[in-house]
Amino acid sequence: MVKRMFCLNALMPAVAFFGVLTLRADSVSFVSVDTTSVAGTSGFLDFTFDPGPFLTQNAFASVAAFSTDGAVGAPAVSGDVTGTLPPSIILNNDTPFNDYFTAFTFGDTLSFTLTLGGPAVDSPDGVAASGSTFAFSMFAGDGSTPVLTTDTLDGFAFTVDISLDGTTKLTNFSDPTSVESAVSAVPEPATGWLCGVGMALLISLRRYYSAVMPR
């Protein structure tokens, strides 16, 4: 009985060790918009990614795999934004206003993959006092009248907020817009190494337990 209790007690730290491991991954969403109701009209698409008013941890928003049967025009870019649509752009929250505003002739559909990542998502520091927000909007030809959304104040089709703990919150104002979340299963390198060490520890303890316990 003493040997049994010793082995069980030895296993407990390893079990606890595994219990506190968490996998951190970027937030990935697949976005598609049914634009048939405004097909053939001229307008604009707007992508923004801005930090909050207080101390904000670094993060980025990637818009990739952009596809449409409409036509993309020339963009107006503000802040820390790189790339061109199509195929992809990256917006960083390094400046107060980061915006990619592009002319667009609507077709029947448009789609893209949205990825939110960086330290604010992967490794929150507990020091930041504000999160960051990604927003996607569609406007009519005057550049200010929202289309395909119930948000007539700001014109957002949807927003995704990054919270202080690295989680994300979606708010969708647009019935024709589908935003489906997908979770990446790739752990941080350090986490993968710790998992390997923990597994080896459990195997060793199990072998020891089998050796010392009477059959």
Regions found by a protein language model. Give the residues of each.
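Short, threonine-centered small-residue motifs that mark membrane-proximal processing/anchoring sites
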Residues: 2-27, 178-200
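A broad, structure-centric signal for solvent-exposed, well-ordered loop/edge residues
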Residues: 8, 42-45, 98, 193
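Generic marker of residues within folded, mature protein domains
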Residues: 15, 21-23, 37, 102-104, ...
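Generic "edge-of-domain/loop-turn" microfeature
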Residues: 38-40, 54-56, 119-121, 143, ...
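Mature, soluble, non-transmembrane domains
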Residues: 77-185
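C-terminal membrane-anchoring or membrane-association module
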Residues: 203-215
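N-terminal segment immediately downstream of the Sec signal-peptide cleavage site
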Residues: 25-72, 177-185
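Extreme N-termini of proteins with methionine-enriched Sec-type signal peptides or N-terminal signal-anchor
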Residues: 1-2, 213
